[in-house]
Structures are given as structure tokens and as C-alpha cells.
Amino acid sequence: MSADFKFHPVAQLVTEFIEHLDRTRCKVHLYAHGRSDGSSWRQRLERAADVFADMGDESDGVIAHRISADDVDVLIELGGHTRGTRLGVLALRPAPVQASYLGY
């Protein structure tokens, strides 16, 4: 989950990792909030995900409900305490295992 699935250091750091995950062992859902910049980084992430959900400006509750409905086991929030963060989604506990990583 991130507002930075675009031309941004977060996307540049996670894209190749996501592209090389073993899909026989996991399914990748990416939840984007914030606006798309249409960059090649955004396009690569859209292609790399099994499910790419553009949540736009939806509320924390709506995003948490979608994540829960998708039966996500591990949720990693990539924004931390940066602009556009949605740490409030984690407070709603939409996944049994949750972490905040990479953003500060």
C-alpha cells in the first residue's frame, strides 16, 4: 500500500523485488492511493501485481474494507510518516500481519 507507486524512490526500490516474487507461493495485491503520474514506474507496478487497486482518495475505512475483502494475509505500508501516508488504514487491522516499511 502506497501513495508512491509512481516516479518516486519508493517505486524505484520495490518494483524489481515485486516483479521477481515467486507467484507459486504468493499473490501480490498493490493498493495505490494518491494520483497516478502515468510514469513507466507506475505501469511496471500495475503489470507486476496480480491485483492493482487504485484507491484514489478513498477513506481509510474504504481502503481497509477492500484489503480485508481481498483476504490479504500480510499488508506492508510503504509510506511511513511521509506526505500522503495512510497509516490510519493499519489502525483498522485489515490484515492479520501488518508492517510499515521504507518510508520514514
Language-model features, listed with the residues they occupy:
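Conserved nucleotide-cofactor-binding alpha/beta core module
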Residues: 1-104
